[in-house]
Swiss-Prot record:
Gene Ontology cellular component annotations, sorted alphabetically: plasma membrane
Primary localization: membrane
UniProt entry tagged with the keyword Hydrolase: yes
Catalytic activity: GTP + H2O = GDP + phosphate + H(+)
Gene: lepA
Record: residues binding GTP: 23-28, 140-143
SUPFAM superfamilies the record matches: EF-G C-terminal domain-like, P-loop containing nucleoside triphosphate hydrolases, Translation proteins
Topology versus the membrane: Peripheral membrane protein
Listed InterPro entries: EF-4 (IPR006297), EFG_III/V (IPR035647), EFG_V-like (IPR000640), EFTu-like_2 (IPR004161), G_TR_CS (IPR031157), LepA_C_sf (IPR038363), LepA_CTD (IPR013842), LepA_IV (IPR035654)
Name of the protein described by the UniProt record: Elongation factor 4
Similarity comment: Belongs to the TRAFAC class translation factor GTPase superfamily. Classic translation factor GTPase family. LepA subfamily.
Keywords: Cell membrane, GTP-binding, Hydrolase, Membrane, Nucleotide-binding, Protein biosynthesis
CDD domains recorded: EF4_II (cd03699), EF4_III (cd16260), LepA (cd01890), lepA_C (cd03709)
Recorded coiled-coil stretches: none
Length: 607
């Protein structure tokens, strides 16, 4: 193909993604677009076709992004090449969304006709506008009995500033309005710009590992051409590889001769090491490199850390391999080795949020067959010590002694909640209870309010979202972004079993809530830890000071069962012997701690 043909082809390429709040019908719309462009044969068609992970289908959510090439014959007689990049909608996976958008020129904004605009709809719109994408608004599910398309149209105009007349009314499930959406894509989404003669620049927006072919990177070509046999260079690491195959996804992988300007496809270059193909890096040709890399998207930092330990210590190395493989597709996952007296060897792992954490744990157990114990998640604290040095703490067990610390800073987030009017009181009460600071309240219309609070991330991370949903009967939507670290009056709470600290049960808590949290936790542990042959005291302590205590009673064995009548001194001797035995056991005895006990720290607020 010469450059003239490449330029002509470029004019007919449309790269777009679909963005929406969770559950507004994004994956169903993607299915319909695939069907209507005849990209998938009817017999291969299944619901949520682009959600390739079993977990995604089970939970009905999209976790990983996916890219597909489609052919569409428009009414103007031309055949267009569409690249559809499917994105997740959940707040933990905003990162995946920002990666998809970096590879597009336009986005379909899907809004539910009954629910209207929600918090994550707005968050994703701002991401799209930051990437200078053209937006095509679609109101989905218009055939629902509760649908109010006219109200939602007005919302889109008022809140996002898109013209009502540009809105397409559709129902992905019933195949209504899909043809109009396809025509609008041709009309609204601009063709990619880029020069086929310039040095190669390709953005890696995703990568996965194949045990036979090495790393497969999903790329978007911005300038230049790449084909099999080319020698490529990664601009971040400077490493060079020879390309063995380039191709496109039609959802199935299909090798092609070359990828050129505007194309979205995959590249295989027998890369064995995950770190050599970093998401966000720019690929260029070794023989004719580009002068500077593409503007990559911002790296997301983990917000939540927890310890993952294999139940069987033999699996320690397998766990490392599992985490490395998951990290390849999920650049926001971080991990480093850690050891715990209670749990042995494992990894301190960083996640974007609680859903992300659950999904990674479930994938490790399911895909790699490793049974895990997870410790309570914690956020990152900055400590300024009395000698002026600073320490970063992501594990409560490593918190320095309180008398050495001058100040502790914890991360705060700005939380935006959209709530029906009737529940404003309940939501504000929840935020106050979680140490929130009220910032702003906006009445969007006569039924919904937008409430903005600044909250400590540690309070949001545990079960804030669940409590918000239950306080509003499931109607609230929620989005948050990190703002800054603020000084707080925090203390480390240690749990002692039989006088020994259990490092995996330590947690960091605000001084005002320390007594209640400590008391609630020891009472909870009393019910979870099985009774031993000897009495076990459970204590909660701040430094040297015990703030709460309870005892787990011992199991009694009747040593007098064999004494029928007879001498009291004989009985006394047996009882004294039992008592001495229990005292000895207590001095050397270890207490087995079940997995539920580690999770008890999380479920503290449910009571």
């Amino acid at each position: 193909m010469d450059n003239e043909q490449r330029l002509k082809r470029r004019e007919n390429i449309r790269n777009f993604s679909i963005i929406a709040h969770i559950d507004h019908g994004k994956s169903t719309l993607a299915d319909r677009i695939l069907e209507n462009t005849k990209s998938v044969e009817t017999r291969d068609m299944q619901d949520q076709l682009l959600d390739s992970m079993d977990l995604e289908r089970e939970r009905g959510i999209t976790i990983k992004l996916n890219a597909v090439r489609l052919k569409y014959e428009a009414k103007d007689g031309n055949t267009y090449t569409f690249h559809l990049i499917d994105t997740p909608g959940h707040v933990d996976f905003t990162y995946e969304v920002s990666r998809s958008l970096a590879a597009c020129e336009g986005a379909i904004l899907v809004v539910d006709a009954a629910q209207g605009i929600e918090a994550q709809t707005l968050a994703n719109v701002y991401l799209a506008l930051d990437n200078e994408l053209e937006l095509l608004p679609v109101i989905n599910k218009i055939d629902l009995p509760a649908a109010e398309p006219e109200r939602v149209k007005q919302e889109i105009e008022d809140m996002i500033g898109l013209d009502q007349d540009d809105v397409v009314l559709a129902s992905a499930k019933s195949n209504i309005g899909i043809e109009e959406i396809l025509e609008k894509i041709v009309e609204v989404v601009p063709a990619p710009d880029g020069d086929p003669e310039a040095p190669l620049k390709a953005l890696i927006f995703d990568s996965e590992y194949d045990p036979y072919r090495g790393v497969i990177s999903s790329i978007r070509i911005v300038d230049g051409v790449v084909k099999a046999g080319d020698k490529i260079r990664m601009m971040a690491t400077g490493k060079e590889f020879e390309v063995t195959e380039v191709g496109i996804n039609t959802p199935k992988q299909l090798p092609v001769d070359e990828l050129t300007v505007g194309d979205v496809g995959y590249i295989i270059a027998s890369i064995k090491n995950v770190d050599d193909s970093r998401v966000g890096d720019t690929i260029t040709l070794a023989s004719r490199p580009a002068s500077e890399p593409l503007q990559g998207y911002k790296k997301m930092n983990p917000m939540v850390y927890c310890g993952l330990f294999p139940i069987d210590n033999k699996n320690y190395n397998d766990l490392r391999e599992a985490l490395e493989k998951l990290q390849l597709n999920d650049a926001s996952l971080e991990f480093e080795p850690e050891s715990s007296q209670a749990l042995g060897f494992g990894y301190r792992t960083g996640f974007l949020g609680m859903l992300h954490m659950e999904i990674i744990q479930e994938r490790i157990e399911r895909e790699f067959g490793i049974e895990l114990i997870a410790t309570a998640p914690s956020v990152i604290y900055q400590c300024v010590l009395r000698d002026g040095s600073e320490v970063t703490v992501d594990n409560p067990a490593q918190m320095p002694d309180r008398d050495k610390i001058d100040k502790i800073f914890e991360p705060y987030v700005r939380a935006t909640m959209m709530v029906p009017n009737d529940y404003v009181g309940a939501v504000m009460e929840l935020c106050q209870r979680k140490r929130g600071q009220f910032i702003n309240m906006d009445y969007l219309d006569d039924i919904r309010v937008n409430i903005v609070y600044e909250l400590p991330l540690a309070e949001v991370v545990f079960d804030f979202f669940d409590q918000l949903k239950s306080n509003t009967k499931g109607y609230a939507s929620f989005d948050y972004e990190f703002i800054e670290n603020k000084e707080s009056n925090l203390v480390k709470m240690d749990i002692l079993l039989n006088g020994d600290k259990v490092d995996a049960l330590s947690f960091i808590v605000h001084r005002d809530f320390a007594y209640e949290r400590g008391k609630a936790l020891v009472e909870k542990l009393k019910t979870l830890i099985p009774r031993q042959q000897f009495e076990v005291p459970v204590q909660a302590a701040i430094g040297q000071k015990i703030v709460a205590r309870t005892n787990i009673k011992s199991m009694g064995k009747n040593v007098l069962a064999k004494c029928y009548g007879g001498d009291i001194s004989r009985k006394r001797k047996l009882l004294e012997k039992q008592k001495a035995g229990k005292a000895k056991m207590k001095a050397v005895g270890n207490v087995e701690i079940p997995q539920d006990a580690f999770l008890a720290v999380l479920k503290m607020d449910d009571e």
